[in-house]
Amino acid sequence: MVVETGVNKLVRLQGKIEGINSKIDEADLRRANAKSSIVEASSRLEKAEGEVASFQRRIRLVQQNLNDVTERAQMLQSKVDNLEDVSESVKQARNQYEEEEAESDEKIQNLEEEVKVKKRELEENEIKLREKERRNVVVHRDIEAATVKADAIEKRIEILENTIKNGLESIKDLEEREGRTNEKENNIAEQISFLDNKFKEVEIRIEAAERNCNVLEHNIKETSEEIKTWKHNTHAIEEEIAAMDDVGDDDTQ
């Protein structure tokens, strides 16, 4: 009985030892698992710290964006206030524009009528200008004809002068050859008188031709001045019409 009891104790002791060893193994396993958990927890902690730092950076960016948005909101509010003021000004300007538009329509009609009148005046001036130019051509032709006549008269004068000179020489020859007789003196006097009359007639014609030339030159100058005046007036009317057309286009726009 005593032996069996010792054996039983030994068995129980071995069982306890095995239980203790089993618990030690379990403890080692738990410790290993705990170390693995600690390593994993450290890794997760580092990752979490990185995520926290990232979140903090994102928070700072969000805060900065929020500040920017706040500033933009304030600017937009200021612009909205300004736009409200501008809107009121636009309303007033629109009312004023509508009032002026009615007056502008009447002004445009008046300008259109004035442009029509100016265009008619321009057409009339162009007709008068063409007539002046035609008259100028005629005057130039008359001057050319008068010049030709003057040249012919000068040639005739030269011929008459030569004739008078030859006549005087002939008279001197007759006086030297035949002496002085009353009959010859009368004939010579008649010839001289005839030649003098012819010379005076030629001088009168020359003076008339010169007067005609002077009149023609004066007419040409007056015609040229009138043409310049008409051209100047026509140019001024064209500029005035162009200015009125521009004003009408601006008012229409």
Curated annotation (Swiss-Prot):
Keywords annotated in UniProt? Coiled coil, Repeat
Q: Does the keyword Phosphoprotein apply?
A: no
Signal peptide limits: none
Coiled-coil intervals in this record? 7-253
Segments crossing the lipid bilayer:
none
Q: Which family does it belong to?
A: Belongs to the tropomyosin family.
- Summarize the subunit comment: Homodimer.
Described purpose of this protein according to its UniProt entry? Tropomyosin, in association with the troponin complex, plays a central role in the calcium dependent regulation of muscle contraction.
Regarding domains, what does the record say?
A: The molecule is in a coiled coil structure that is formed by 2 polypeptide chains. The sequence exhibits a prominent seven-residues periodicity.
Q: What is this protein called?
A: Tropomyosin-1
Q: Which source organism?
A: Hydra vulgaris
Q: Which gene encodes it?
A: TROP1
